[in-house]
Amino acid sequence: EDLPRGWGDEQAPGSYRLRRRDDGALFGFAAGAQSAKPVFFPTDQLLWRGRRTRGGRGLEVDPATGPGADADRGGPPYAVLGVRSCDLGAVGIHDTVLTGRGVGDVHYAQARQEAFIVAVACSDPGGTCFCGSMGTGPAPEAGKGARFDLSLTEVLEGGHGFVVDVGTQRG
């Protein structure tokens, strides 16, 4: 009910148009401009809390939020529905940068570890899409880009249905 059944889009440089589809597709639109990154790496996040010491010349960091404290995003884990393979490729790069090389962002790592990702294959890529040239699509592949728990390919011929690929044990 909350998914855009029967809607598609037309994307071209400098142009974006919604269009009605006759097939009732739930995912019949191309990847939008907003990626999955803000789900895992928000623009506003509490990292630590502190207060001035008596006399106002120093800073006392709350041990529950300071360096070495366990990451706490302050909310439940996310389930992300409709992540496209190009976004999985980008999240895979974020994973390397933000969790690799021995130094990482514990908050990002926790969000990624807890998230349940349902990827969706692009059946109608936009005119501005470049997943084919980057080797990231149009369908998600296990081991390429970021991990996904489930991947859906929408099938409209012979009735509306989905082919489901399992990417992880949780899926």
What is the meaning of each model-derived region?
Residues 1-171:
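Iron-sulfur-associated redox domains of electron-transfer enzymes in respiratory
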